[in-house]
Amino acid sequence: MSAESHYLDAIESEENGEIEEALEHARLAVKADPEHSNAWWMITTLLAPDGKYPDIEQASKALVACTKVVNLDPTRVDAWVKGGRLMVDHLGLYEDALHWWQNCRDAAPLESVPIVEQTTILSDLGMYPEARDRLSSLFQENLDIANSQLARISHLHRTLERSAEQNPDSHFKPWKKNDGGWTAIKMR
């Protein structure tokens, strides 16, 4: 059976709600043709569907499949987004996600999404000056920003400006066992 036949069977199985069977057919498709990016993408979305929380094994396998997709087709921004979200939201791989988004920037230099995602990660890590500088590059490079995102990005930029000007010792650092923020949390 050809890779395309397995892929079509995977689509049919998914449409019938037979997720495990769809996953098996998609895996057979990539076994027959390791460069079948649509089958790799199907594996990704079956293992980690939007709106669901995959376990760590599913998230890891979905990330492997997603990596195959972006290696085969670096212009697939949807795959970059999915991989980045898997790394941060499900696997806690913040530093790897920063590199992931930099690779996305290299593959799609006119996209604003990687800069916004890197900014968010840096901000989550408490690296406010770096996050501010990264977000500023969005404006310096004159990248296209959707009108729907402009207000959110402007608000984020103002927030980062204020945070970057604060004393870094006043920021909560959850990775530090004796940070004062833990005392405030325990008091609640």
Task: Put a short name on every predicted segment.
Residues I11, T44, P49-I56, G84, ...:
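Short coil/turn linking the two alpha-helices of tandem helical-hairpin repeats
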Residues E15-H25, G51-K68, L91-N103, G126-R134:
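Structural signature of tandem alpha-helical TPR/SEL1-like repeats
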Residues S2-A32, A48-Y53:
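Alpha-helical segment of the N-proximal tetratricopeptide repeat
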Residues V30, T67-V70, V88, R105, ...:
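A conserved position within tetratricopeptide repeats
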Residues S123-R188:
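Eukaryotic alpha-helical solenoid repeat scaffolds
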Residues L8, M42, K82, E117, ...:
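Canonical tetratricopeptide repeat
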